[in-house]
């Protein structure tokens, strides 16, 4: 899951790095320095941080959006790494760059950070200033910087959680059992069927997935296959969840006061006896 891109171009150094098939990027032999955080940006849950003051510790920077399901699904791992390794020197920083008008509102970002109980610092990058400095390509994106402030590794999309944690441990000089998979579909090496692509607005029609989500703003009810779901805050909301990847039909209708910006689908583990998905 997540974007697959032929290369990433760092605009500060013009260094091209090769994207691996897994979505991971190998750092090039020449050092790529961590871009600074523009000082005028608002940090929603801590006093402003400066990247140059993080030297001597590894820093994990994650681009995310509370209205994108792929971003939400990485949060348990980021929170766990913060709790596990902050005392050893790791700094986890969330860069919130909204894809929708509602997720570019700084107050909405702050409310989402509180609601999601995010324990690590988050900066609101609503004008894509940090995004552009990084030459970032999608959500979520995970940049690991070493103690010198040089790029150590980069991953686009979900997954590779164990690999990232082992890299963190290597930089810190510690060795522990990694955070276990937070969902069955996160099991290392598991091949997942392809899910239906994201659809604009309130989608009604056939789909194949393990779950269906909707990006919603406003307050009100959305009908999901005739079932009323009350929405009280903006974000990406889970509407349908299956124990395994399956085909289904979705009927959505947003009521007064509610706007549906996108319908999203996530993969599920194959059902017992189902043919194995082809390798990527």
Across the structure, where does each feature detected by a protein language model lie?
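Short active-site neighborhood of thiol/selenol oxidoreductases, capturing the structured segment around
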Residues: 48-72, 78, 92
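Thiol/disulfide oxidoreductase modules built on the thioredoxin-like
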Residues: 57, 114-118, 124-169
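Compact recognition or signaling/catalytic modules
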Residues: 2-3, 7, 42, 50, ...
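Non-globular targeting/processing and membrane-anchoring segments
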Residues: 1-49, 54, 162-280
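The substrate-binding groove and active-site-proximal loops of carbohydrate-active enzymes
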Residues: 66-67, 96-98, 153
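Sec-exported extracytoplasmic/periplasmic mature domains
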Residues: 83-87, 114, 150, 169-176
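Structural microenvironment flanking redox-active thiols in thiol-disulfide oxidoreductases
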Residues: 72-116, 124-132
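Proline-centered helix-kink/hinge sites
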Residues: 35, 70, 76-80, 87, ...
């Amino acid at each position: 899951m997540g974007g697959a891109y032929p290369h990433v171009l760092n605009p500060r150094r013009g260094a091209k790095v090769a994207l691996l098939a897994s979505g991971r990027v190998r750092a090039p032999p020449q050092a790529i320095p961590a871009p600074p955080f523009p000082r005028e940006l608002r940090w929603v849950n801590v006093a402003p941080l400066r990247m140059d003051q993080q030297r001597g510790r590894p820093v994990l920077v994650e681009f995310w959006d509370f209205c994108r399901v792929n971003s939400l699904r990485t949060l348990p791992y980021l929170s766990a790494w913060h709790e596990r390794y902050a005392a050893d020197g790791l700094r986890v920083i969330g860069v919130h760059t909204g894809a929708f008008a509602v997720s570019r509102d700084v107050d909405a970002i702050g409310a989402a950070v509180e609601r999601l109980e995010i324990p690590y610092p988050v900066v609101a990058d609503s004008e894509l200033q940090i995004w552009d400095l990084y030459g970032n390509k999608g959500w979520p994106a995970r940049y690991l910087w070493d103690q010198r402030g040089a790029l150590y590794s980069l991953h686009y999309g979900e997954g590779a959680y164990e690999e990232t944690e082992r890299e963190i441990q290597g930089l810190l000089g510690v060795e522990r059992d990694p955070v276990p998979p937070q969902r069955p579909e996160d099991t290392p090496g598991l091949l997942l069927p392809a899910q239906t692509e994201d659809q604009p607005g309130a989608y009604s029609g056939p789909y194949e997935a393990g779950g269906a989500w909707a990006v919603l703003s406003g307050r009100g009810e959305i009908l999901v296959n005739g079932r009323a779901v009350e929405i009280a805050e903006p974000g990406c909301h889970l509407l349908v969840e299956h124990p395994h990847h399956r085909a289904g039909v979705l009927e959505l209708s947003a009521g007064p006061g509610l706007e549906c910006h996108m319908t999203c689908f996530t993969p599920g583990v194959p059902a017992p006896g189902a043919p194995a998905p082809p390798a990527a």
